[in-house]
Amino acid sequence: MMHDDPNEAGLPPHNDAIPDETAEGADEVNPLHHRRIRSFVTRAGRVSTGQRRALDEFGPRFVVPYAPEMPDWDAIFGRSAPRILEIGFGMGASTAEIAAHRPSDDFLGVEVHEPGVGALLKLIGEQGLSNIRIIQHDAVEVLEHMIAPASLDGVHIFFPDPWHKARHHKRRLIQPPLVAHLASRLKPGAYLHCATDWQNYAEQMLEVLGAEPTLENTAADYAPRPDYRPVTKFERRGLRLGHGVWDLVFRKRAD
């Protein structure tokens, strides 16, 4: 997810891991694994003193260790509630804001970058949020091993790395195998919400999501920004400069 000031965190605006060029061959084994953790190197980002303190203080409660097994999410959250998965929450400002405004929903954020995890934990502590849990691991493996079929009420993927060069488009997160896997984890009627500020990526998202037979678009093409998704300072700056932002909201078909 895009965060308010990426430069302060030592991270670029689009906060995905960077594939290791030498590991591209691993992608050919299973197309779903185009974001496998062994094919990635994380961008170097400085963990601030406040983030480190939050990692130490709140990590034991709110960070769920990755394990290749299905956890008891009701026990982890301490209740049974609608569950939303967010892939790549960046520095977590929007995640915290959404969770604060939707206290009856639970949010599971997946992020590989430690500064972002620390930043969100800091917000959790400052705001007294209890409906967020974090996994610091590759999202594909989390999806495969820790999320049961038809168990999610929603998925958020906000401002993933656009990989704007044409030769890098195959590295984009929104690809047919991943979308099919995400759709399999959604309950009937649950939603998948993507957002991007790159028109070419928005067009690809629309094509890929529209081709998934178990999903249906909630709009003719792009959706109005739902009220629950906040506009970040970084996004607002882009809008002032005339940059577009595209939201796509699809739902899992009931049949």
Swiss-Prot record:
The keyword tRNA processing applies. It catalyses: guanosine(46) in tRNA + S-adenosyl-L-methionine = N(7)-methylguanosine(46) in tRNA + S-adenosyl-L-homocysteine. It is an enzyme of class 2 (transferase). Substrate binds at residues 165, 197, 232-235. Its EC number is 2.1.1.33. PROSITE patterns: SAM_MT_TRMB. Keywords: Methyltransferase, S-adenosyl-L-methionine, Transferase, tRNA processing. NCBIfam families: tRNA (guanosine(46)-N7)-methyltransferase TrmB. This is tRNA (guanine-N(7)-)-methyltransferase. It comes from Burkholderia cenocepacia (strain HI2424). The lineage of its organism: Bacteria, Pseudomonadati, Pseudomonadota, Betaproteobacteria, Burkholderiales.
